[in-house]
Amino acid sequence: VLGLILIVVIVLLAVFGPGMNSYTYSGQDLSQKNFAPRVPGLEQFGILDGSEKMSTTTGTKVTNAYQEKDKLDVYYWFGSDLYGRDIWTRTWEGARVSLIIAVAAAVIDMVIGMSYGLISGYFGGRVDMIMQRFLEVANGIPRLVIVTLLLLVLQPGMVTIIFALMLTEWVGMSRIARAEMLKLKDQEFVLA
């Protein structure tokens, strides 16, 4: 239950997170670089108020870049990076891309793997033997090599990553589907 709640929260933040503030994914302001996290409402409690402890040769020093640069109306919920880009927006934009790749690869993997495994298990005999030998060869090629070669040959991007995952990750699903088909095909309710 906790895992499902966490996944739902991540999906909701990936969808709505970048729109929760005024910053864009690629927008940058070099005058606001390396700001610590600052969240409206929590700053009154001394939590996420934009201050940070810095170690110096004489000890530690508490600084607040928002006050030093007179940016009291600026809020970076996760802080800003060395180019002055909002980390909150960039985090959830990245999560959005990762979720799209994961869902697409899982769906394609399930369709190819289940189809291959069910066909192999259903027909059995020579068809099953040939399909399983091909599966063993495909499983013997290291996945990292295939992914790296595809990224070198094709233009790097989301489609290439989905294609690489699709080519390499269907083997496990195929074996599971084949085993289930072989188990079910000999059951009495099927033979009747």
PLM features: residue spans?
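Alpha-helical transmembrane segments of integral membrane proteins
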Residues: 2, 80-192
